A protein has these predicted regions:
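Mature, solvent-exposed C-terminal subdomains and processed small-chain segments of exported/organellar
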Residues: 1-83, 88-168
């Protein structure tokens, strides 16, 4: 698969109120092994910094009524494939897209606020630990990690070593 998206934009018009949108951003796939797990954790942190409910962008879009409680986002990393996706309902999906792109550029230029990064890192780590309470989640994570050539349960040590610079 090429490093570029097949098309920059695809729009389908249907009678729906409110409109539903999905944004996708292709990322470089990670190599197998511990680097795969590190990239997964860094991608999740970067996604939270950009789109998470604690991020400045989320607060702005929500207060302006451009997104609602149905807004969702995530970072996925598989052997040979990586992506960030976000979607939900919006009266102006293009304004959401433009705001996400602008905030991504701002974060790349200025970096992530140190306090926000520390909170997000604790939150992502906490979510991983809480995920251990779900047998289904553990099975999925172990299987995906196996195919990526890494031991999933090493995530605590890998997580500790991730710095703000890694997520930026």
């Amino acid at each position: 698969e090429t490093g570029r998206a097949a098309s920059a934009e695809k729009e389908l018009t249907m009678e729906m109120a409110p409109p539903i949108f999905q944004l996708g951003f292709k990322a470089d796939p990670a190599p197998a092994g511990e680097e795969h797990l590190r990239e997964q954790l860094m991608g999740e942190l970067a996604c939270e910094a950009l789109l998470g409910s604690s991020s400045p962008l989320y607060a702005k879009l929500y207060s302006e009524g451009l997104i609602n409680k149905n807004f969702g986002y995530g970072f996925e990393l598989y052997p040979g494939c990586a992506l960030m996706a976000a979607g939900g309902e919006s009266r102006d999906p293009k304004a959401v897209r433009d705001a996400v792109l602008a905030e991504g550029e701002r974060l790349a230029r200025e970096g992530i606020d140190e306090g926000l990064f520390r909170r997000l890192k604790k939150g992502v780590y906490g979510a991983k630990v809480r995920g251990l309470n779900s047998f289904e989640n553990v099975c999925i994570e172990l299987a995906q990690a196996h195919f990526a050539g890494v031991e999933y349960l090493t995530f605590p040590g890998v997580s500790v070593a991730i710095s703000k610079a890694h997520a930026e």
